[in-house]
Amino acid sequence: QTAFITNNNISITGASPKHSFYLGVGYSYEQGNIEHEKFSKVTINASNDYKITDYLKVGFQFNGARMLPADSKQVLNALRATPIAPVYNDEYGLYSALPEFQKAQINNPMVDVSLRANTTKAENYRASGNIYGEVDFLKHFNFKAMFSMDYASNNGRTYQPIVKVYDPTVSGNIATLGTGKTEVSQFKENETKVQSDYVLTYTNSFDNGNHNLTATAGFTTYYNSLSRLDGARKQGVGLVIPNDPDKWFVSIGDAATATNGSTQWERSTLSMLARVIYNYKGKYLFNGSFRRDGSSAFSYTGNEWQNFFSLGGGWLMSEEEFMKDIKWLDMLKIKASYGTLGNQNLDKAYPAEPLLSNAYSAVFGKPSIIYPGYQLAYLP
């Protein structure tokens, strides 16, 4: 469809030699090129910086949003569906199932677009911001402390209706997709990120500006946690769950069909860092850095602390006298660097401590007793 999009923003800003502020509110709405995939968002942004004295400055920033995400469907299946299959059967007034060689993997995308339209209600909330203080002292020193936080809360409910399609390969030419039962599911997810940074910087020039030095030392902490709960229930015998958002709650379904799941983890890092940047006459460049990181994700291995460093150098040749007459070349720099890196952001929250998952069971004894089997979900 031809979609309607609107973006609306209003803001207030002001500044003086010692104070600046900003406040903005926005609203966005997208109808979506695919029917029933509308999206809307309300945002608020605020910031304030205040220069208390010539050497002391404080401020904050806040961003908030409420989003109603699109009721997304598997429309990309249209790219994979065979082009010879009819989309709709006029005689039966039903959408068609795809041919036998495809229908086990792919549904007719129009079934999702039309028959499963508006079957998801979700709300996403997010708030993030920071406060900071910055002080200059002893002419060449600067110290900045910042505390940041990011909080997200997402929840949603989904309804699965009974969907019938035209399928000439079954008796009566009408097939029911899935289990043939209405179903509701719910989820709720919260994630928190907290970070603090403390950075001391020394900047100075010597010998009439020929030697320029910037040295930085810092200490940072980071905390991240996530908690998610999922649940679903199907209808009871003869008790169809109505297609009414006010009734899309798992408490309405048959308790005997309940399924649930959860995900939760938390971890933190602590880092100490130092960096030196030096140049001579702006042409000969050097930098070196060192950091020591500790991560709770590896605490069970006794190897949670690691050291990382980097060294780099450069030569800005275009600033040399013998390059001044080359007009067609604006800048020429030769540089090289070497360093070590680490990564804790793997697809597992605890890469060093794998969880157990179900495996093949075994039967022993008379009478027979089933012994459930377990295995490591992944190798550490």
Give residue ranges: language-model regions:
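Generic detection of intrinsically disordered/low-complexity segments and helix-coil linkers/edges
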Residues: 21, 82, 86-89, 95, ...
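Intrinsically disordered, compositionally biased low-complexity regions
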Residues: 167-168
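Short acidic/polar alpha-helix capping motifs at helix-coil junctions
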Residues: 9-11, 93-98, 116, 236-240
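Extracellular/periplasmic, surface-exposed regions of secreted and cell-surface proteins
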Residues: 41, 47-56, 61-66, 76, ...
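Acidic, glycine-rich flexible loop segments
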Residues: 1, 5-7, 76-112
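Gly/Ser/Thr-rich beta-alpha loop segments that engage phosphate groups in nucleotides
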Residues: 16, 95, 341-344
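Residues embedded in well-ordered regular secondary structure
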Residues: 1-36, 73-75, 113-118, 133-136, ...
